Amino acid sequence: MSQSYINVIGAGLAGSEAAYQIAKRGIPVKLYEMRGVKSTPQHKTDNFAELVCSNSFRGDSLTNAVGLLKEEMRRLDSIIMRNGEAHRVPAGGAMAVDREGYSEAVTEEIHKHPLIEVIRDEITDIPGDAITVIATGPLTSDSLAAKIHELNGGDGFYFYDAAAPIVDKNTIDINKVYLKSRYDKGEAAYLNCPMTKEEFMAFHEALTTAEEAPLNSFEKEKYFEGCMPIEVMAKRGIKTMLYGPMKPVGLEYPEDYKGPRDGEFKTPYAVVQLRQDNAAGSLYNIVGFQTHLKWGEQKRVFQMIPGLENAEFVRYGVMHRNSYMDSPNLLNQTFATRKNPNLFFAGQMTGVEGYVESAASGLVAGINAVRRFNGESEVVFPQTTAIGALPHYITHTDSKHFQPMNVNFGIIKELEGPRIRDKKERYEAIATRALKDLEKFLNY
């Protein structure tokens, strides 16, 4: 091939992973990132793989589909997983990272790689025949988004995403909260703000009547269920939050708790959890409280949470518009487009949802871009693995009803033989098979 390098556009999680996977296989990369030249309202730095929403990579157990996906990615030498592990912060049974330290480490490793040339510039058009991975994410610039929109057949696929507020730990009233992980799983990693029924009812009323920031679009509000604004959830019903982010089960009061409670109940009526957001432990995010309320309203309403009456918000919640492609009609399982095998897409724009899933798509796209570059046949990971099931789902589901998807055991190929009734045992069996099949696939 006359082309001497591969283009990667976008240095988020998917683009950073794709660039690394290409370079580690000996192919030069030109990595384009517009931040540094043109910023977005949601990004706070110019670093690569910045985590805009939560700092959590979610569950770490192999009986959790995202835990399996992460383990598969570790075995494929994922730059995102490796640096995530190096910058972990306590989060019970989940994997959370110091977002600044982690993204700085990814940025440094990319910059130091001898085969990766970083170009700070905005790309406004889709390259012609050059082998290219586009991983510009949900915050793609308007000009490039318009070109992708044309590729999409003019159809608008989108939903709205929101991020949760972050507070300064030193401004939390520690006497009103307690340290505990749900069901005491893992280390006690969350600060829990318990509410009585009276406190919850007042909070729910304030939340459902608070003023929201206006959307910069005439389009209908559509949300991805995994990142729904807390005020939207609250409006679905008085108890919706009690089965979601404010679920109290497994978060019993400690014996020495002296704050307000409903009679002699051992468990609060509702609980708001705070999760450590940086390695120093000075910042905590409000778990599941992504929001689109006006900033003044966020301060007023969220300071009703016990322990946060005088909390200082170092970042308020924000919302942004996520666009995604008609992947069932446009993409192959390799993340190459059906019409142009030299053009690959990766990340949330393909319809995978979540940090880990985005990085995984970049990993697969990067590997296949190299194979295309070398004139080799592209690879499709086994559908028995999480990293193979995800691209299979987004490219084979019904286009009319296509929406972004997190990895889950439901999209992984079913086990052969009699169904295992116990869910944990079934998931363990799926994970064991996945890792064996991945090993066979890599050694083939």
Curated annotation (Swiss-Prot):
One of its GO terms (molecular function) is flavin adenine dinucleotide binding. Catalyzes the folate-dependent formation of 5-methyl-uridine at position 54 (M-5-U54) in all tRNAs. Pfam families: GIDA (PF01134). It is found in: Cytoplasm. Its main location: cytoplasm. InterPro entries: FAD/NAD-bd_sf, MnmG-rel, MnmG-rel_CS, MnmG_N, TrmFO. Keywords: Cytoplasm, FAD, Flavoprotein, Methyltransferase, NAD, NADP, Transferase, tRNA processing. SUPFAM superfamilies: FAD/NAD(P)-binding domain. One of its GO terms (cellular component) is cytosol. Its EC number is 2.1.1.74. It is an enzyme of class 2 (transferase). The keyword NADP applies. FAD binds at G10, A11, G12, L13, A14, G15. One of its GO terms (biological process) is tRNA methylation. It catalyses: uridine(54) in tRNA + (6R)-5,10-methylene-5,6,7,8-tetrahydrofolate + NADH + H(+) = 5-methyluridine(54) in tRNA + (6S)-5,6,7,8-tetrahydrofolate + NAD(+); uridine(54) in tRNA + (6R)-5,10-methylene-5,6,7,8-tetrahydrofolate + NADPH + H(+) = 5-methyluridine(54) in tRNA + (6S)-5,6,7,8-tetrahydrofolate + NADP(+). Belongs to the MnmG family. TrmFO subfamily. It comes from Streptococcus agalactiae serotype V (strain ATCC BAA-611 / 2603 V/R). Its cofactor is FAD. Coiled coil: none annotated. The keyword Oxidoreductase does not apply. This is Methylenetetrahydrofolate--tRNA-(uracil-5-)-methyltransferase TrmFO.
